[in-house]
């Protein structure tokens, strides 16, 4: 690797360790068939990756985001939460349906189970069926 290439990249990515992570990730992408943003000039993938970062044909922020996504095992999906719609009608029927007060919420009680009952319930569960995975 040319020292000039690394010095150009340090101006774009200040942390050398982060630069190594980003350049190696980009080099792996190039090896996997990602399109080049600059001419190769008989350079290997790590040098091409550093030249792309140094010439800013690919941004360090984009590479960082791609690196994070490639390392994630589970992708969190934000699902919209169901919203409750308040009643707009002031009719007597609507007043009968509407909750009376928040003190009713405090009166809600749940069934309690002793530890012995819980253990007896767990003992009655069927054990999982074992499969023979050695043949694969």
UniProtKB/Swiss-Prot annotation:
Which UniProt key words apply to this protein?
DNA-directed RNA polymerase, Nucleotidyltransferase, Transcription, Transferase
The UniProt annotation puts the region (Disordered) at: 79-107
Would the keyword Nucleotidyltransferase be found if you checked this record's keyword annotation? yes
Q: Which GO terms are recorded in the biological process aspect for this UniProt protein?
A: DNA-templated transcription
EC number annotated for this UniProt entry: 2.7.7.6
Q: Which Pfam families match?
A: RNA_pol_Rpb6 (PF01192)
- In terms of domain of life, where is this protein from? Bacteria
Q: Which InterPro entries match?
A: DNA-dir_RNA_pol_omega, Pol_omega/Rpo6/RPB6, RPB6/omega-like_sf
Question: Among the entry's GO cellular component annotations, what is one?
Answer: DNA-directed RNA polymerase complex
What reaction(s) does this enzyme catalyze?
Answer: RNA(n) + a ribonucleoside 5'-triphosphate = RNA(n+1) + diphosphate
Tagged with keyword Transferase: yes
Any one Gene Ontology MF annotation carried by this entry is: DNA binding
Locations of Low complexity compositional bias?
89-107
User: What is said about its interaction partners and assembly?
Assistant: The RNAP catalytic core consists of 2 alpha, 1 beta, 1 beta' and 1 omega subunit. When a sigma factor is associated with the core the holoenzyme is formed, which can initiate transcription.
UniProt record similarity statement: Belongs to the RNA polymerase subunit omega family.
Q: Which HAMAP family match?
A: RNApol_bact_RpoZ
Q: What does this protein do?
A: Promotes RNA polymerase assembly. Latches the N- and C-terminal regions of the beta' subunit thereby facilitating its interaction with the beta and alpha subunits.
Question: Could you identify this protein by its name?
Answer: DNA-directed RNA polymerase subunit omega
Encoding gene, per UniProt annotation = rpoZ
